[in-house]
């Protein structure tokens, strides 16, 4: 009887949660369940588990302090907190409190599959007043990561390659997180974000007042998220692939009727996909993402051009770097089938010519007006195309001369002439001497096959 009484009292104790355990293991539901199971089996150990939970919470709090201290050390912490509470934090503030601070929501979407910086399902949130874009843990309700809206520099909406069902990856690239421009010393960069949405309607998307959106109005999840982002972005807009810029020569692998906008490539041993967009070249979707914005590209060239593949070399320079800061990024094993499309894209945007790099940077900052720059860029592009054709013809002429030099025997000038047409020997004989023979060789070298045609006509 007494044993049954103990069990009933234990069950009664566990019918309500223990606050210390809830706080300590909020982010680890499986571990929290094991703790409660252990308490159920040995209820006399409840005080012990509470002490362990409190100690765990203190450790978590201790480890959460260092990231915020360097930012606020020299900048009046009290004033900083007041700014955060008013929603007016400065754009260059790097404290996690910017995105974690409590703020009214304008939009949220549950069960969003994130790939970067964490691979898990989270709730996507956009705070009101162009505040921040962030991801919240659906179990612990804690903000995992985020970025202030005014720190976002590029937003891409790209079709996920090689999927049987249409999906889209949203890629958020904050300032100093494009893989090209490093943050200034002492300044922290927000992490890039990548999440995936399906082509169908949003199943769990809500407005700021809690009303469900996107479920019955015919708007897809991709279109809904894109619209919300465009309404809140201050420095850019969502960029999608445009077939006027580039489309792959090969269709989607699993959806043959659809055009593909990606190209497979390798950076070192890491495989990824290249997208040639209206604002730059993107390589993803694995860490670290790289976005080659037009204003950072010095020039683009080809190397290791083989029968089936070729490499793309992109020379880039950071915004705050001098001429000596230029670095090259090689993207290899690109299929030859896409060479023509990539080459047309590069020439259309003037990326093959390093002399146009300053014009691209000027356009980024809107120096001298956009229209004048576009006209200048168009003229420069035409000149660049003509120059490339001239260089091509020059290379062909040099190759032809090299082949003729291989046939030339320096041992005897007179005998070397005999290696040509025998009819020419019969007509000309040896009367004109060595100087005339050398003159004939020069004519043949310059005119090639045309010299042979002239000789035959004379016969």
Swiss-Prot record:
Give the highest taxon in the source lineage: Eukaryota
What keywords are assigned to this protein? Chaperone, Chromosome, DNA-binding, Nucleus, Transcription, Transcription regulation
Compositionally biased spans, kind Polar residues:
85-97
UniProt cross-references to SMART domains, sorted A to Z: Rtt106 (SM01287)
Is this entry keyworded Transcription regulation? Answer: yes
* Stated role: Histones H3 and H4 chaperone involved in the nucleosome formation and heterochromatin silencing. Required for the deposition of H3K56ac-carrying H3-H4 complex onto newly-replicated DNA. Plays a role in the transcriptional regulation of the cell-cycle dependent histone genes by creating a repressive structure at the core histone gene promoter.
Stated name of the protein: Histone chaperone rtt106
Species: Aspergillus fumigatus (strain ATCC MYA-4609 / CBS 101355 / FGSC A1100 / Af293) (Neosartorya fumigata)
């Amino acid at each position: 009887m007494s044993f049954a009484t103990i069990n009933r009292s234990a069950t009664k104790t566990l019918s309500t949660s223990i606050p210390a355990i809830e706080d300590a293991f909020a982010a680890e539901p499986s571990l929290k369940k094991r703790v409660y199971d252990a308490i159920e089996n040995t209820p006399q150990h409840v005080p012990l588990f509470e002490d362990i939970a409190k100690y765990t919470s203190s450790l978590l709090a201790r480890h959460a302090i260092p990231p915020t201290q360097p930012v606020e050390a020299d900048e009046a912490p009290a004033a900083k907190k007041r700014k955060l509470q008013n929603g007016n934090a400065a754009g260059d503030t790097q404290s996690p409190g910017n995105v974690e601070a409590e703020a009214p929501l304008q939009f949220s979407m549950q069960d969003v599959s994130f790939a970067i910086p964490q691979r898990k399902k989270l709730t996507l949130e956009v705070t009101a007043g162009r505040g921040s874009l962030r991801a919240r843990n659906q179990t612990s309700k804690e903000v995992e990561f985020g970025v202030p809206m005014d720190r976002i520099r590029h937003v891409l909406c790209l079709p996920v390659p090689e999927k049987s069902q249409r999906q889209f990856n949203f890629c958020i690239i904050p300032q100093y997180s494009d893989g090209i421009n490093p943050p200034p010393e002492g300044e922290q960069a927000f992490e890039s974000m990548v999440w995936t949405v399906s082509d169908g309607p949003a199943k769990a998307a809500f407005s700021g007042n809690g009303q469900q959106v996107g479920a019955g109005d015919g708007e897809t999840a991709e279109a809904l998220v894109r619209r919300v982002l465009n309404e809140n972005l201050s420095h850019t807009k969502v960029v999608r692939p445009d077939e006027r810029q580039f489309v792959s020569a090969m269709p989607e692998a699993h959806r043959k009727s659809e055009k593909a906008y990606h190209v497979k490539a390798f950076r070192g041993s890491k495989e990824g996909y290249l997208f040639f967009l209206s604002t730059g070249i993107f390589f993803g979707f694995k860490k670290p993402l790289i976005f080659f914005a037009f204003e950072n590209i010095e020039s683009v060239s080809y190397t290791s051009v083989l029968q089936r593949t070729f490499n793309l070399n992109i020379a880039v320079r950071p915004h705050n770097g001098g001429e000596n800061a230029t670095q090259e990024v090689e993207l290899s094993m690109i299929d030859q089938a896409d060479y023509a499309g990539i080459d047309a894209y590069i020439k259309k945007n003037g990326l093959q010519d390093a002399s146009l790099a300053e014009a691209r940077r000027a356009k980024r900052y809107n120096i001298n007006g956009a229209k004048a720059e576009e006209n200048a860029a168009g003229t420069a592009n035409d000149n660049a195309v003509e120059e490339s054709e001239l260089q091509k013809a020059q290379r062909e002429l040099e190759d032809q001369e090299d082949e003729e030099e291989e046939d030339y025997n320096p041992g005897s000038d007179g005998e070397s002439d005999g290696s040509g047409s025998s009819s020419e020997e019969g007509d000309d004989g040896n009367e004109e001497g060595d100087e005339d023979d050398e003159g004939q060789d020069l004519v043949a070298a310059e005119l090639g096959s045309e010299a042979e045609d002239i000789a035959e006509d004379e016969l």
